[in-house]
Curated annotation (Swiss-Prot):
Domain of life the protein comes from: Eukaryota
Segments for region (Disordered): 1-73, 820-847
Protein known as: Nitric oxide synthase 3
Residues annotated with Phosphoserine modification: 116, 617, 635, 640, 838, 1179, 1181
Residues annotated for FMN binding in this entry: 528-530, 532, 574-575, 656, 663, 689, 693
Source organism of this protein record: Bos taurus
One function term, GO molecular function aspect: calmodulin binding
Subunit annotation: Homodimer. Interacts with NOSIP and NOSTRIN. Interacts with HSP90AB1. Forms a complex with ASL, ASS1 and SLC7A1; the complex regulates cell-autonomous L-arginine synthesis and citrulline recycling while channeling extracellular L-arginine to nitric oxide synthesis pathway.
Amino acid sequence: MGNLKSVGQEPGPPCGLGLGLGLGLCGKQGPASPAPEPSRAPAPATPHAPDHSPAPNSPTLTRPPEGPKFPRVKNWELGSITYDTLCAQSQQDGPCTPRCCLGSLVLPRKLQTRPSPGPPPAEQLLSQARDFINQYYSSIKRSGSQAHEERLQEVEAEVASTGTYHLRESELVFGAKQAWRNAPRCVGRIQWGKLQVFDARDCSSAQEMFTYICNHIKYATNRGNLRSAITVFPQRAPGRGDFRIWNSQLVRYAGYRQQDGSVRGDPANVEITELCIQHGWTPGNGRFDVLPLLLQAPDEAPELFVLPPELVLEVPLEHPTLEWFAALGLRWYALPAVSNMLLEIGGLEFSAAPFSGWYMSTEIGTRNLCDPHRYNILEDVAVCMDLDTRTTSSLWKDKAAVEINLAVLHSFQLAKVTIVDHHAATVSFMKHLDNEQKARGGCPADWAWIVPPISGSLTPVFHQEMVNYILSPAFRYQPDPWKGSATKGAGITRKKTFKEVANAVKISASLMGTLMAKRVKATILYASETGRAQSYAQQLGRLFRKAFDPRVLCMDEYDVVSLEHEALVLVVTSTFGNGDPPENGESFAAALMEMSGPYNSSPRPEQHKSYKIRFNSVSCSDPLVSSWRRKRKESSNTDSAGALGTLRFCVFGLGSRAYPHFCAFARAVDTRLEELGGERLLQLGQGDELCGQEEAFRGWAKAAFQASCETFCVGEEAKAAAQDIFSPKRSWKRQRYRLSTQAEGLQLLPGLIHVHRRKMFQATVLSVENLQSSKSTRATILVRLDTAGQEGLQYQPGDHIGICPPNRPGLVEALLSRVEDPPPPTESVAVEQLEKGSPGGPPPSWVRDPRLPPCTLRQALTFFLDITSPPSPRLLRLLSTLAEEPSEQQELETLSQDPRRYEEWKWFRCPTLLEVLEQFPSVALPAPLLLTQLPLLQPRYYSVSSAPNAHPGEVHLTVAVLAYRTQDGLGPLHYGVCSTWLSQLKTGDPVPCFIRGAPSFRLPPDPYVPCILVGPGTGIAPFRGFWQERLHDIESKGLQPAPMTLVFGCRCSQLDHLYRDEVQDAQERGVFGRVLTAFSREPDSPKTYVQDILRTELAAEVHRVLCLERGHMFVCGDVTMATSVLQTVQRILATEGDMELDEAGDVIGVLRDQQRYHEDIFGLTLRTQEVTSRIRTQSFSLQERHLRGAVPWAFDPPGPDTPGP
């Protein structure tokens, strides 16, 4: 973060964060520019930057045309010239006068902010508030929005009624970062975006101040890996005293005045040392005694608090070659934390806002140790070095100073404590100047403070002219609190130890209600299609509540601009279809991809497009990702932070390895957050639904909690308690749930909207037709629905339709017979949960669970709850606590704890909840358990099989009716929930549904572009809409589009050749040029699949269409087929295009980028031996490899024989 220091007691060039504030346009102390008057420059939006000239003595400068006057700024080393246009935004005069330059004064009186006797004038405050609010909304690109206008009105109303206003937390974070960014004396501002802001505005006492400060020191010190941070206490309020920290820094060494007038310790701290003694501190007698803190709450006497020794990290100083140096007994503390400056944001003044960074080595080695009015060790070291101190021409001071600085750097690096040398710091400042010139048109800078105290002209900043001015927000000086008449309460108080304060907080009921507010805030985001990611996110929220203040949000409820102000974000997300985000994560994904990062601030448009379209291509092996990841590894605390510089994050992805793009969206989010400057606390977690997903999530969640606690230095006592957070005894207790009778009955469509949190519409059945032969043992149906022209059911060919089916009535009735305490059959009920009370807070109360609408138990099991999917390990653990038979309890416990045993049981039996209860008959089944613990019944998605132009007001579906037996064909018969229901519908029956767009699976807008369509079985569904659309183009628009090629596959030509007559008709009318069919079970013919047709009959055409004619290829079907087709196309391109297989893979990647290779992939269609054994074997081998050493949830990069992400 650069160096932050207490300026009031250490004048001169800064250390620490270097946040001195010498101001005034004439405060520059460098070489004088030959231009006596300011030049004219363009408007602030486009600052003029002439070409850099290599000849510093004669730079070429083209004077811009007429425009406002701005300072011309020259770099005398490079000869380059820029214009500072940002200074036009300064609203405050500097300390200088027309006749007198005061730029070299350390504390010009004009720059000190003194408490005013009354509140500031309302119009003055409003002017500053408007300016700041405008800055904030401009920064988030919402300037002029409705939210912006409403916020301005809100501030104006608050000022009118109270004389002041309050910042939102995001505004406070933005303001604190901007104040650092605007600090003219700080040399380390390149890291301004990484400032961690702790909001302590709820603080009400000196004791609470001390707790916050201890947390700040612990977080910022971070065992030597220092992190920049600021803690902001309540703002100055009219008619009330201030919160103040009397010490100039949180950590300082005492200075003891001796009888002979000398000082033992640090002479800069004599006054505060004597004040501490007056307030009860028992002093030591060492040269490096850490001072206690004097903290003052409004209108109260200051209180004294002793910092615990383990909180203060110190570094003993030694020299890499001078062995005697260690014997000098020198040391210095690691954390520079300025605590006596005032933070001003939008006219609001925060009189206590300690901030910290890390040291620049010269501040310790030159200023603190060598200054004559400080430790003054220069001559002692020179004598030990045998230097001639009798004459200045021996340069003994310079030689000794260099060795002392070398010792400081060596010692800090040896102790692994963050520090930066003055050369690296000044080079980074030049980068910052360049960044700011491009971003804002200038940068306020005080040359006298930016140039380090040694090696002046050896650093690049010495040769750089700078312009000094005041911007808001800002850090400002303020008078010492013990000086003047403003101090109240001069009484002496007894010192309080850290342990006393901690115990006081622990036992004080009045403080318990505010403890949560003091915790670090965590945001948990989820995106889910089935609800499982949401369930995991809620479990994560319960875990993090042990030590953090978490909130759980769906991605579509979250404003992505808030990421810039977050401290900790955890993401739990699934991946939909072909590597896409779930629907409720699409807006988040789009906004995340639009943000710019520190290593790709100006990405080419095609890179943005690639990132937005191909989430599945964001992997560790991508060249773009590898490039910026390498830059990030090479970066340091002297490099620019990204937009998310203060963000720490963890990501967990849910998916199925049956899909080729396993957890692709989670990988994209994880990669993108790091690219934008966020810090990954934990490796990406992944859970495979085919094998051990819940176990993987539990392991990842505990590891994420542990890493977060360590990062934010919280929750030591919570780590042990978190070990059993996933225990069923903790997650569900019978006595905490009850049913309450509700007056209102269920209306199905509003109920589905409530449950699924999305718009739903009702269509009605026109017809249901079996497309297979009557001789076939299987069924594929064409379902025609009437949409009644509803706008919400408008679609384009290639889109999906979501159907909300009910469970089979027989299954529901059988399950109801097992419920131990069912409510009356016709009574609408709701679940209520007992919320715990808190000491000093509200008492325990019953709160309605909002997951389900009021309905009967039968309605809940029919329309809203999933009773056919195998119960999760978590639900089995819960059922084990309700089993009365010990053997059944043990078996359920074993199934829930042994991932392999569970997966074998699940895949062999694929049991419904009813079958589980039949296997374990002693399990009691309370009604509240069903209503709160069963997963939601999810919509089923189908490709739309029609074109709206061909069938206005209708939507068609092509559905394979699913029926199979479990247990190797010997178990009970299972039916597809939705397909079986659809097959039984009659004309006029209602169907709740909605449209989900598939913009990446659409016909090209140019009808003359050639297309190849590949879809076996029900994979032909979206292509029916395609050929209907093309027929409409031919017959209604008179177009002659390029004939398409269709590759279809089925078992037998006489049984399941879907839409054969329609396809033949479309071919005759010019839609298709070629139609080829692969039969896998045709009598007296070899098995043939669609990929065989591509390889043997269409190889040349595939290459020509994709590589020469810029055509498109569409593939629709299950994951195994899509993967085989992809591999076949890759081999065809390699063979026909005379290239290596890897090169052909790159070509396919480009085709995907250009949206010319399209896939519409669905999961395992039937539980065939071939598919399940292959996928599960792979999953188990991965799991067993993890058990041999790797964590079971960690990201596995693709190997040479495995599909990519």
